[in-house]
Amino acid sequence: MIEIFKDTGATHDLVYHSKINTFVWDVEFDIVLSDSKELNKCYFVKCFNPYRINGKCDFAVSSIDIFSEGKRLLIENEFNFKITKAVHVATSKDVTEIVLHLSERISSPFPIVKEVVYLD
């Protein structure tokens, strides 16, 4: 069963991307897709700019990495980072709860919480 939760206030809907055989959140930024075929994980792209080369450096990290990094930043009361774009596929509501927790604390307008695809 597939459930799609849509944020009615969002400007974009969740769309199906046939190239990676999964759903993606079509945000206003450039979409960077993971090459992974694993549908039981989330893959986020976080804006990262270590050397200020060409204004920014985008890279993809796994859900485990982004959640661990997010928790570390929350503990240190550091909220100055943004999740700029994402591919979000979940088989567990635990993932949604973590994303919800982070989105409540991160100073980012990225509306990911209501955009979840459950594949189980």
From Swiss-Prot:
Impact upon substituting F59E: Complete loss of the ability to inactivate the host DSR2 NADase activity
Record-level GO BP terms: symbiont-mediated suppression of host innate immune response
Location of site Interaction with host DSR2?
F59
Q: Which keywords does this chain's UniProt record carry?
A: Host-virus interaction, Inhibition of host innate immune response by virus, Viral immunoevasion
Record lineage: Viruses, Duplodnaviria, Heunggongvirae, Uroviricota, Caudoviricetes
Q: Gene that codes for this?
A: yotI
User: Mind telling me what this protein is named?
Assistant: DSR anti-defense 1
Assembly: Interacts with Bacillus subtilis DSR2 (via C-terminus) in a 2:4 ratio; this interaction leads to the absence of activation of the NADase defense activity of DSR2.
Signal peptide (from-to): none
Protein family according to the UniProt entry: Belongs to the DSR anti-defense 1 family.
What the protein does?
Counteracts the defense-associated sirtuin 2 (DSR2) defense system of the host. Inhibits the NADase activity of host DSR2 by competing with the tail tube protein that normally activates DSR2.
The question of whether Secreted is a record keyword is answered with no
Source species, domain of life: Viruses
**Membrane-crossing segments per the record:** none
Tell me yes or no: is Endoplasmic reticulum among this UniProt entry's keywords. no
